């Protein structure tokens, strides 16, 4: 189920189980994982397959392997808060994913996360090709970090 309220999403989580975050791009899907205490977000991997069945199967494998209790999906909206073509694509993907999982799904504003991830990697002297291979997973970890920080800030 897709949850629009962070407090409600948090109430549905199982204690001591991690979350995953997804940065759903047009060419790659970045995946990040939290620790069990919901304190740290870490880039996990990048899915380069564009077939949604394969993407969902890959995500289901990650969910099972890490015993994930919830999913955060980055929602791309424009700088003024409006809906874009990619917003609609991500919403359709979230709807499709919810048919395959019984976990709560939370959509988090992801404005500028991929750009921030690329700049972060660049600051370490990582070459463009390597940045492009990893920026979506790092962006997913930034999206997840936003949610984890909000949970901490609101003492959820």
Swiss-Prot record:
Pfam families with a match to the protein in the record: RuvX (PF03652)
Top-rank EC class of the record's enzyme: hydrolase
GO biological process: rRNA 5'-end processing
Superkingdom, taxonomy of origin: Bacteria
Entry's localization field: Cytoplasm
Family annotation (SMART domains): YqgFc
UniProt entry keywords in alphabetical sequence: Cytoplasm, Hydrolase, Nuclease, Ribosome biogenesis
The protein, known as: Putative pre-16S rRNA nuclease
Organism of this sequence: Rickettsia typhi (strain ATCC VR-144 / Wilmington)
